[in-house]
């Protein structure tokens, strides 16, 4: 009788393990299945890493960034996943971050040149105050092509930090149309340079965006 009870309990634990394994999450097999294409795209563009973006790190395992939340330019709460559908360069920045301020014009020019149905730059400001300061900064340097998205709780940065992507600011992630990581970079870059644009164009082609 004791043996039968023990076997039943073991079977129940086994079934629970199967159920938990089947639930998608940050490290679950659901993420692996949903974002395997991001890793394939990363492999396809490996030869484009270098020059101005030599520090760009390609995704070696599936990473889903769709749940990263922020407030869009219209003041509505949203997520990266809700705005998926094209290759996107997600850039976390703050007004107190000098390298962030320096690279913002390059991101603006990149959006002006490549932005459209297949690609977009998605900046997320993580200043902890209201949006007045970052808005004034963008206006002062005449940013015309980028929206002011905000995350004063810094949850986006904390999420990327927990995923091993963010060491500081700025941090930039290239994601595919399903919000799956293709690669990321810590520190500033000349994002409108020939090297960066070649990498992004290759990602768009490889991802089928």
Regions found by a protein language model. Give the residues of each.
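N-terminal targeting signals for export/organelle localization
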Residues: 1-65, 209
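Short, solvent-exposed cationic patches
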Residues: 27-28, 102-103, 200-209
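Conserved redox-active cysteine motifs that mediate thiol-disulfide chemistry
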Residues: 84, 92-109
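Alpha/beta-hydrolase fold active-site loops
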Residues: 87-88, 119, 170
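Structural recognition of the beta-strand scaffold that forms the well-ordered cores
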Residues: 91, 122-123, 147-150
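Structural microenvironment flanking redox-active thiols in thiol-disulfide oxidoreductases
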Residues: 101-142, 153-160, 198
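Thiol/disulfide oxidoreductase modules built on the thioredoxin-like
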Residues: 141-145, 151-202
